[in-house]
């Protein structure tokens, strides 16, 4: 099975669907001030036709209500900043392209659009037709839009997904080179770490180059991704997932070879690695780069560690179940996340269960002829 066929969130609206379980409202709340500042700089840059329309894309949009939470924040930021900066002008039409892989459940988003448009008109005064939302399926590691056609590109929790599992893991190091691990965890051998970093560098460089070509000169890009932290004893969600799968091997429910032959196409970069790749690629100026933390159970009101742990397990399952099921089989998925919840219940009370996040705002450098 092709990797892109299983790189999608759980579909539909069931208990383990992405629509029901993914909750990154706190991350969006932390990102919003940066989003508003990015939009403010964009409107001041006087890009082509920006007073008439603004063309935006959300790269790696996923599915369900969270997709439209991002869209809402983008629209609200454009309207708020527009009123502050150019209140004598009419609101520009906003065209938003939702991008994800072909297998993404776009229909779950489209079903929400009628109520979303009505709410936008009620709360923002935006008449239906002044905000146009459509899908642009395809890998964001390839061309999506014509050259110099976009004003603003946004991506949240997507660029840590690689285009493929690093080929060097099998070709150069051999099957099982990443023994006992499912990604480039802290305990991996240096050659495994290098293989993952090399793949991320290649993919992220391609991402920057291709999308810089799609942006107008001085266009903006705002990226939020999971990043490495300095805490030696912290556990991210993939660490807990790895521990859960290892439990099944130790208990005899899963063959060791099955674990050793599985590697997630995910790399969690450091802030310095991201900064260096952007500078080396050269198409963008870094306007600002900051990091922040989000607890796994942030915003969860029930004060019960086991219920919180089940909630975290459901959220992580919504993201990783398709790719796990394609390798390990669907039957063992409940067992994986039952053990995941047990590990989560241990780290949550200690404050060690959180995501480190990086947010970076980029401006496309002008062509020499534009200077």
From Swiss-Prot:
Q: Which residues bind Mg(2+)?
A: 178, 260, 262-263
Q: Which Gene3D superfamilies match?
A: Methyltransferase, alpha-helical capping domain, Vaccinia Virus protein VP39
Tell me the keywords, alphabetical order.
Alkaloid metabolism, Magnesium, Metal-binding, Methyltransferase, S-adenosyl-L-methionine, Transferase
Name the positions where S-adenosyl-L-homocysteine binds. 18, 61, 66, 100-101, 139-140, 156
Give the cofactor note: Binds 1 Mg(2+) ion per subunit.
The question of whether Metal-binding is a record keyword is answered with yes
> In which pathway does this enzyme or protein participate?
Alkaloid biosynthesis
Q: Which cofactor names does the annotation list? A: Mg(2+)
What processes in GO biological process is this protein linked to?
alkaloid metabolic process; methylation
Q: What does it catalyze?
A: 7-methylxanthine + S-adenosyl-L-methionine = theobromine + S-adenosyl-L-homocysteine + H(+)
| Residues under site feature: Involved in substrate discrimination | 154, 266, 330
Query: EC class of this enzyme?
Result: transferase
Summarize where theobromine binds, as residue positions. 157, 160-161, 355
Q: Is the Ribonucleoprotein keyword given for this protein?
A: no
Name the Enzyme Commission number(s) assigned to this protein: 2.1.1.159
The similarity annotation says: Belongs to the methyltransferase superfamily. Type-7 methyltransferase family.
Q: What does this chain do?
A: Involved in the biosynthesis of caffeine. Catalyzes the conversion of 7-methylxanthine (7mX) to theobromine and with a lower activity of paraxanthine to caffeine.
Full protein name? Monomethylxanthine methyltransferase 2
Q: Which organism is it from?
A: Coffea canephora
